[in-house]
Amino acid sequence: MRTIAGLSPITAAQAAGPLETSWAWCTVRGDDGYLAAMGRVLGDGGWYFHIADVATDPAHQRRGLGRAVMEDLIFRIDDEAPPKPYITLLGDPPGRSLYRSLGFVDSEPSLGMRLPR
């Protein structure tokens, strides 16, 4: 799913276990089990929650699946976390309008950073 949706590729070793160690996750599957959309939440369970790996198969985009994944993840944070959680994500250009429509705002003057490996 990561590759076909345009996310950075990961190795099998990197893929072994992220769902089990995520605070929450959501998938949308077809009747045949085909993975059409996904997303997950990383967090400490108290205050900080980071939404990551939100992706939709291009063959299933523009059908509301990404929105459904995001709404489910946000609902779970709001429902299960203590009040006033700090929710972040890194919004790639294709998803920014969706994220903004869900209430996300730019975090300026903060800027997301990464450590290349």
Predicted regions and their residues:
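Short amphipathic alpha-helix that is part of the acyltransferase structural core
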Residues: 1-13, 110
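A short helix-loop-beta-strand connector motif used in the catalytic cores of GNAT acetyltransferases and
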Residues: 16-27, 31, 83-85
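Conserved GNAT acetyl-CoA-binding A-motif
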Residues: 70, 77-91
